[in-house]
Amino acid sequence: MFNVLVIDDSLTVRAIIEQLLEDEKDFRVVGSADSVAAAREMVEKFVPSVITLDLAMPGIDGFAFLDELAGHPHAPVLVVSSHTTWGSAAETEAIERGAKACFDKAQLVRHGKSFVALVRKAVSNTTTLNGA
């Protein structure tokens, strides 16, 4: 069973991600945070197998949190953001800062199975992956 921490300021997006993953037998969403500040404690408390992270959030953004996580042996991070479309500067920066992969938030509903497959690859692979 893979434990997932979902970090996104949008309640709707968090609900979509949670539903996609909880429909799978091998995933369990152990925490859901609307900010980096809320997520920090959850990372230590729940020790997730994988983290999904939005980039554009109030307060501390996802890029800064990627930098924080880089110095710790935490779970792989899958960035889920409308800013990380394939080939975008934000996608490149997220990967450079330690994200395992990126997925375009706008594609979650249409390509939910691809998202789940990417999360599954992130927890089982140590190399950088490509997302939608």
Protein language model features and the residues they cover:
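Active-site beta3 strand of CheY-like receiver
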Residues: F46-T52
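Receiver (REC) domain active-site loop signature in two-component systems and cognate sites
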Residues: M57
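Alpha4 helix (beta4-alpha4-beta5 surface) of REC/receiver domains from two-component response regulators
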Residues: A64, H83-A117
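Two-component/phosphorelay signaling modules centered on CheY-like receiver
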Residues: F2, L11-G31
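Short amphipathic alpha-helix used as the core "switch/output" element in two-component signaling
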Residues: F63-H74
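Active-site residues of response regulator receiver
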Residues: D8, D54
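Acidic catalytic/metal-coordinating carboxylates
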Residues: S35-A38, D61-A64
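Receiver (REC) domain switch/output surface
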Residues: G112-A132
